Amino acid sequence: MDFTIFPPEFNSLNIQGSARPFLVAANAWKNLSNELSYAASRFESEINGLITSWRGPSSTIMAAAVAPFRAWIVTTASLAELVADHISVVAGAYEAAHAAHVPLPVIETNRLTRLALATTNIFGIHTPAIFALDALYAQYWSQDGEAMNLYATMAAAAARLTPFSPPAPIANPGALARLYELIGSVSETVGSFAAPATKNLPSKLWTLLTKGTYPLTAARISSIPVEYVLAFVEGSNMGQMMGNLAMRSLTPTLKGPLELLPNAVRPAVSATLGNADTIGGLSVPPSWVADKSITPLAKAVPTSAPGGPSGTSWAQLGLASLAGGAVGAVAARTRSGVILRSPAAG
């Protein structure tokens, strides 16, 4: 593009900014180049240290495998530094073009002065001044156009850069694709195990459990046992009614024996209240009172028998539950307020 075809107002207006954005970008690329260079040096140092302590065919294969990656880091660092240098060149060209351009206020002053002289040039007395202003304006035009053309040329040259290349693949692409397929199949298998076993459920039951009306359905299901009980009661009533109808349709000759049949099969039940036999204050069956051979244990044991069973004190715990009964009735009760004293004590 030839910028000399544009008036100076246009060129001066478009180059009024500063070169600071270019300088910031150049600094960023420079820092990236330094970081990559440092990474390459550390990479080489680590690999050399590993090869020194680990020797053999495996060590050689490892060193040969990682060598392309170190070379890629070094190449990328060099390209980043080249980009930083080119941006710095563009920044310098921009600053030079900005300095070579005529300031926009100067051009505006030239145009306004010419307009005023042309307006008041009634007798041609301002014609020489008008020609001088036009010549100066033409110089501004040429100066801005040449500065913009020089800047455009330098910027286009700096934009021609060596493209960056991606690093070498870390694995065989075919094997990597196969690995992805295996991972996908494993995920599908695990997912099939983790999925709910809905295939074994009846479709109607699954629909019942998954519908939004499940609470209403659950309430309906909970009432089914009650309905069965009611149906059973109604069925028994129906059976009794049918039996009554059948009895009514029988002749008196057959009806009499059938009416006596329940009493013949089921014995009569009788009960009385408040007439039970008693022993003391305890109500007992009649057979207990009729059997006179039962003798209380307290009367059967002679009074001259030993006062207590032999053995340790633990053996006497079994008699604790008999206190107040047949055995406890003959035991002498000691008053808690009497203190026994030995005759020898006086």
Curated annotation (Swiss-Prot):
Stretch list, region PPE: 6-159
Inducing or repressing factors: Up-regulated under microaerophilic and anaerobic conditions, nutrient starvation and in the presence of palmitic acid. Coexpressed with PE11.
Chief location of this protein within or outside the cell: secreted
UniProt-annotated location(s): Secreted, Cell wall; Cell surface
Domain of life: Bacteria
Gene Ontology biological-process annotations: response to host immune response
Keywords: Cell wall, Secreted, Virulence
This protein's GO CC annotations: cell surface; extracellular region
InterPro entries: PPE_C (IPR022171), PPE_dom (IPR000030), PPE_sf (IPR038332)
Other information: Shows a strong immunoreactivity toward tuberculosis (TB) patient sera compared to that of BCG-vaccinated controls. Could be an attractive candidate for serodiagnosis to discriminate patients with active tuberculosis from BCG-vaccinated individuals. Could diagnose both pulmonary and extrapulmonary tuberculosis cases. Can also be used as a novel serodiagnostic marker to detect latent tuberculosis infection (LTBI).
Similarity annotation: Belongs to the mycobacterial PPE family.
Domain notes: The N-terminal domain is essential for interaction with TLR2 and activation of HIV-1 LTR. The PPE region contains the information necessary for targeting and anchorage to the cell wall.
Protein purpose: Induces pro-inflammatory responses. Induces host TLR1/2 heterodimerization, which causes an increased recruitment of IRAK1, MYD88, and protein kinase C epsilon (PRKCE) to the downstream TLR-signaling complex that translocates PRKCE into the nucleus in an IRAK1-dependent manner. PRKCE-mediated phosphorylation allowed the nuclear IRAK3 to be exported to the cytoplasm, leading to increased activation of ERK1/2, stabilization of MAPK phosphatase 1 (MKP1), and induction of TNF-alpha with concomitant down-regulation of MAP kinase p38.
Subunit structure: Interacts with LRR motifs 15-20 of host Toll-like receptor 2 (TLR2).
Name of the protein described by the UniProt record: PPE family protein PPE17
Gene assigned in the entry: PPE17
